[in-house]
A protein has these predicted regions:
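Active-site environment of divalent metal-dependent phosphoester hydrolases
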Residues: 28-29, 58-62, 86-90, 108-111, ...
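Metallo-beta-lactamase
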Residues: 75, 80-137, 237-238
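Catalytic core of the metallo-beta-lactamase
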Residues: 9-14, 109-164
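Metal-dependent catalytic neighborhoods of phosphoester/phosphodiester hydrolases
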Residues: 63-72, 89-93, 220-225
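Pre-active-site segment of Zn-dependent metallo-hydrolases
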Residues: 18-57, 64-72, 147-164
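Active-site neighborhood of phospho(di)ester-bond hydrolases with catalytic His/Asp-centered motifs
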Residues: 21-23, 48-62, 80-84, 140-146, ...
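Cap/insert and terminal regions of metallo-dependent hydrolase folds
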Residues: 78-81, 150-243
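Feature captures hydrophobic
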Residues: 257-315
Length: 315
């Protein structure tokens, strides 16, 4: 198994002749210009890609512009992997773009190559994780999955019993929500994410941890202030070294690592140091359209009615 870091929550896994990439957000901003990538993504050779796994619908994972940038000539050879959902929205959209889609059954092993199996599981808030197992190495992409709720703690412990020790864990290390102007709340939220990572490591006991799914920054005039308290890759790296439960493997876009081979984090950390500094010096996004409060209230009521009509459980 080879692991190549692309950016943010995107890694390219090469195993037994198969190439699987996750959550490609390769360029541009997202969340209405509220988030931007800290570093420039490395190039993806779509002609080599067999599978694209999408964890959930948030635009830093299901990034429509990046998916639309895939050349038409490669689409026939690429299969998207996604969780089965009631609305089929992502599935239908991908098919409309001429992609093949395979919906993954919850907690079921699927063979994708000789001696290579994947397993996907749903979690609260419509997220999902992916386990890749080649018989020698188990790589778990947990991305943004909620692991502190009672429901997921139960699932995760059961999951750990089923699969045994995970060799490599990749998960989110920074908060993503808008937390307002209360500095204390932001600090507590940042610490809670590190505590969540520590809990994941306690239960799953990975040999290695790859900092993941948090290589973006708040890039809009209205949310930039939140960067001050959020966790950086340096914070999670130091946190893990102090805890001594696992070995952090910090990868920079374009870095390739073979599990159980030695890896020096210093090169990646030095590059990220420059990128963080550069990102925070860039002009802030401020081209969001402004609307008056009454207009927004009316639109929210219309949206509420639309959701009720489309959701059988709310009728």
């Amino acid at each position: 198994m080879k692991i190549k870091f692309i950016n943010h929550a995107s890694v390219l896994i090469n195993v037994n002749g198969v190439n699987l990439i996750s959550d490609p957000w390769l360029f541009g901003s997202t969340f209405y210009d509220g988030w931007s990538l800290i570093s420039k993504s490395c190039q993806v050779d779509w002609g080599e890609i067999d599978y694209v796994w999408i964890s959930h619908e948030h635009p830093d994972h299901f990034h429509v512009p990046s998916i639309k940038s895939i050349p038409e000539k490669y689409k026939a050879n690429i299969t998207f992997l996604y969780q089965s959902t009631m609305d089929n929205k992502v599935n239908n959209w991908l098919k409309s773009q001429n992609f093949k889609v395979k919906l993954l059954p919850n907690l079921k092993k699927i063979k994708i190559a000789s001696n290579v199996f994947i397993k996907s599981g749903k979690t609260p808030q419509d997220d999902s994780w992916l386990l890749i197992d080649d018989g020698k190495t188990k790589f778990l992409n947990l991305n943004d999955c909620e692991t502190k709720s009672k429901q997921f703690k139960f699932i995760m412990k059961k999951f750990a019993r089923e699969i045994g020790r995970v060799d490599i864990l990749a998960s989110q290390f920074g908060f993503a929500s808008y937390l307002g102007y209360n500095q204390t709340i932001r600090k507590k939220s940042a610490q809670s994410v590190l505590d969540k990572v520590d809990y994941q490591i306690e239960v799953l006991k990975p040999k290695y941890y790859i900092p993941f799914a948090s290589f973006s920054y708040f890039s809009h005039k209205e949310n930039f202030l939140q960067n001050k308290e959020n966790n950086s890759v340096f914070d999670v790296h130091d946190f893990l070294l102090k805890k001594r439960r696992t070995l952090p493997v910090v990868l920079y876009p374009g870095d390739t690592w073979i599990p159980y081979k030695s890896h020096n984090n210093n090169s990646a950390l030095e590059k990220y140091k420059k990128d963080y500094n550069n990102a925070f010096q860039k002009p802030l996004n401020d081209n969001t359209k402004k609307y008056n409060l009454n207009f927004l209230k009316q639109k929210s009521l219309e949206y509420k009615e639309k959701i009720i009509k489309k959701n059988v459980f709310l009728k």
